[in-house]
């Protein structure tokens, strides 16, 4: 990708207006406490700050050191960023004495600048070190993991996190190749997969699923998502909004099931003598499922797989059936 194309992608936040609107920042809520769990390059945070009142507070998270450096350009006493995973939400709020929040926004996946920077190792389109860590200051790189992991575990990761039907063959090829030389670059891994996967999906590079799987595993993306969903719910004030943008089916499935589990509760047999006030009540209300418009996808093709789900925490009074 040339420099112009890289620049083109750097400042495009997917579903920017829709996500911030979903937080419902008007009225008294304008002076609430909000969380941007994935600062990235700050598109959502900056727009949220534009709509918040002087008494509001916005706490952002990001594991990427480049994102933290970018956040330093925001000179606003209402804003603070934590160099950590959003899975540490509970600890971060407790340290700051925050008892509840009025909205949580999560924009999952990786940002365009991360993909386009070959030194990060996220993309198979340009050669670079096989790293794939969101936070390059911590943890094991993809190259280090592939050098030591068992063939069975590599297969499991590629199959489960990449939904790759050739996971067995790819894992076998990786182990065979590492016996000859270290697999230390994105090009090496992409070539291994390309030689192994004989059936090609239309419009998709054969390495797509394998790179996704390893990235998800290295960064514990799905485990951290499950943690933050529960912590966000725990801290949401009545009528607080949970807004989540996901980019692949594994993420979206977790978000959908979590929200549905809070919104839909099993009802006991109606023939049982149970008072209405004692019946199980929903804890959240499902508000919307939004996809990017055709216009946004045309301007930013990377938005095409995005899905935004929005739910609102119900107040105790609202959860009682009258």
Swiss-Prot record:
GO molecular function terms noted in the UniProt entry:
rRNA (cytosine-N4-)-methyltransferase activity
What Gene3D superfamilies would the database entry show?
Putative methyltransferase TM0872, insert domain (1.10.150.170), Vaccinia Virus protein VP39 (3.40.50.150)
Q: Which Pfam families match?
A: Methyltransf_5 (PF01795)
Q: Which reaction does it catalyse?
A: cytidine(1402) in 16S rRNA + S-adenosyl-L-methionine = N(4)-methylcytidine(1402) in 16S rRNA + S-adenosyl-L-homocysteine + H(+)
Q: Which terms does the UniProt entry file under GO BP?
A: rRNA base methylation
List UniProt keywords, sorted A-Z: Cytoplasm, Methyltransferase, rRNA processing, S-adenosyl-L-methionine, Transferase
Quote the EC number: 2.1.1.199
Which of this chain's residues are annotated to bind S-adenosyl-L-methionine? Answer: 42-44, 62, 86, 107, 114
Annotated Gene Ontology cellular component terms: cytoplasm
Provide the protein's localization.
Answer: Cytoplasm
Q: Which InterPro entries match?
A: RsmH, SAM-dep_MeTrfase_MraW_recog, SAM-dependent_MTases_sf
Predominant subcellular localization, coarse grouping: cytoplasm
Under PANTHER family, the record lists:
12S RRNA N4-METHYLCYTIDINE METHYLTRANSFERASE (PTHR11265:SF0), S-ADENOSYL-METHYLTRANSFERASE MRAW (PTHR11265)
The UniProt family comment states:
Belongs to the methyltransferase superfamily. RsmH family.
UniProt-recorded name of the protein: Ribosomal RNA small subunit methyltransferase H
Organism in which the protein naturally occurs: Janthinobacterium sp. (strain Marseille)
């Amino acid at each position: 990708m040339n420099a112009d194309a890289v620049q083109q992608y750097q400042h495009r936040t997917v579903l920017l207006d829709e996500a911030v609107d979903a937080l419902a920042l008007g009225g008294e809520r304008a002076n609430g406490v909000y969380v941007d769990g994935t600062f990235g390059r700050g598109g959502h945070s900056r727009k949220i700050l534009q709509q918040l009142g002087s008494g509001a507070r916005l706490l952002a998270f990001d594991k990427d050191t480049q994102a933290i450096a970018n956040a330093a350009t925001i000179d606003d006493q209402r804003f603070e960023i934590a160099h950590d995973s959003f899975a540490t939400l509970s600890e971060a709020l407790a340290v700051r004495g925050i008892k509840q929040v009025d909205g949580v926004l999560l924009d999952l996946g990786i940002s365009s600048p991360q993909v386009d920077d070959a030194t990060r190792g996220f993309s198979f389109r340009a050669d670079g070190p096989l790293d794939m860590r969101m936070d390059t200051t911590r943890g094991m790189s993809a190259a280090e993991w592939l050098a030591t992991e068992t063939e069975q575990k590599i297969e499991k990761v590629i199959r489960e996190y990449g939904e790759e039907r050739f996971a067995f063959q790819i894992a076998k090829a990786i182990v065979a190749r590492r016996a000859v030389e270290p697999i230390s670059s994105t090009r090496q891994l992409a070539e291994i997969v390309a030689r192994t996967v004989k059936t090609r999906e239309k419009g998709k590079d054969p390495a797509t699923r394998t790179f996704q799987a390893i990235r998800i595993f290295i960064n514990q993306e799905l485990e951290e998502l499950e943690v933050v969903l529960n912590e966000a719910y725990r801290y949401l004030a009545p009528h607080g909004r949970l807004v989540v943008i996901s980019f692949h089916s594994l993420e979206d499935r977790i978000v959908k099931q979590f929200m549905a589990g809070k919104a839909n509760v099993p009802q006991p047999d109606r023939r049982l003598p149970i008072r209405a006030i004692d019946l199980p009540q929903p804890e959240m209300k499902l508000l919307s499922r939004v996809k990017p418009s055709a216009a946004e996808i045309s301007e930013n093709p990377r938005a095409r797989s995005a899905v935004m789900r929005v739910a609102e925490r119900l107040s105790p009074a609202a959860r009682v059936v009258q």
